[in-house]
């Protein structure tokens, strides 16, 4: 194979980010078209199948996107411009190199902010605003004073189709992996939404049983009390939560003491409705 890419970033000796460069005045589309051509020709096989993220770059514009794999399809809807905290696109190549492609961000992008979606078998990389949101949530939890019963949370306001489900899952995963909370509860306002979200979260997870369902209020109470690490991420509904104090299998005083001593984070989907 005589194909040769422009730049390859290695982490621990493994090729994980491939960068294709074009000179000023040449559209960035030529760079990503070349990456797609290389993929069709089988360049990213063997050792180079480890490449997770592609970057197409010319001095005034850069886009990044996940490697869909040999059997995957490139979709330009998922070619992203990196942006700052205010969602202003960053196009200058020097800023992209320093803010996205340098240590520690390049490590974090590959290690924390890509998701292998089991639903379609395609690797997904998060947009910049998803990164900022998930990072802000996990940082907030890290700094939480759990003894302060009046401690406030926060909200993320993203539009329809912006990837809120992935953002909420990644936030919960970061919190769970950091051990900054004992439980992370995905709270849905409709049972049907809970079923759908459970399927999506399990598709994002490393293993399907990393995200726990709650068939009824009794199961919810049991998993809230549990010290098993497998019961850290839980999907439930407002209905089941509200039934805790009214159903026969709800809480007793001992349960209340056990649960109140745990650090519990609630992530509420469609919070404006509930």
Residue map of PLM features:
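Conserved helicase ATPase motor motifs in RecA-like P-loop NTPase domains
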Residues: 159-160, 272-274
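Conserved RecA-like ASCE ATPase "motif II neighborhood" in helicase/translocase motors
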Residues: 233-268, 274
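Conserved motor-coupling elements within RecA-like helicase/translocase cores
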Residues: 217-234, 258
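ATP-dependent helicase/translocase motor core
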Residues: 1-183, 188, 192, 196-208, ...
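A generic local structural motif
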Residues: 40-42, 172-173, 218-222, 250-255
């Amino acid at each position: 194979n005589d194909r040769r890419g422009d730049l390859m970033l290695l982490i621990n000796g493994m090729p994980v980010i491939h960068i294709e460069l074009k000179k000023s005045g040449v559209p960035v589309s030529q760079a990503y078209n070349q990456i797609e051509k290389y993929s069709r020709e089988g360049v990213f096989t063997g050792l180079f199948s480890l490449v997770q993220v592609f970057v197409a770059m010319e001095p005034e514009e850069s886009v990044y996107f996940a490697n869909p794999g040999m059997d995957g399809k490139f979709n330009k809807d998922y070619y992203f411009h990196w942006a700052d905290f205010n969602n202003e696109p960053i196009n200058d190549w020097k800023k992209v190199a320093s803010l996205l492609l340098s240590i520690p961000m390049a490590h974090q992008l590959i290690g924390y902010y890509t998701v292998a979606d089991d639903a379609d078998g395609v690797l997904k990389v998060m947009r910049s605003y998803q990164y900022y949101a998930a990072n802000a949530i996990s940082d907030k939890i890290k700094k939480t004073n759990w003894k302060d019963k009046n401690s406030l949370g926060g909200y993320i306001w993203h539009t329809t189709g912006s990837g809120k489900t992935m953002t909420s899952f990644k936030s919960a995963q970061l919190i769970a992996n950091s051990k900054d909370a004992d439980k992370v509860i995905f709270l849905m306002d409709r049972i049907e939404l809970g079923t759908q979200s459970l399927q999506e979260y399990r598709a994002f997870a490393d293993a399907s049983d990393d995200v726990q369902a709650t068939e009824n209020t009794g199961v919810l109470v049991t998993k809230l009390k549990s010290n098993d690490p497998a019961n850290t991420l839980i999907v439930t509904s407002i209905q089941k939560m509200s039934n805790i104090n009214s159903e026969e299998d709800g809480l007793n005083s001992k349960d209340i003491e056990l649960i109140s001593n745990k650090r519990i984070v609630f992530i509420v989907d469609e919070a404006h409705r509930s």
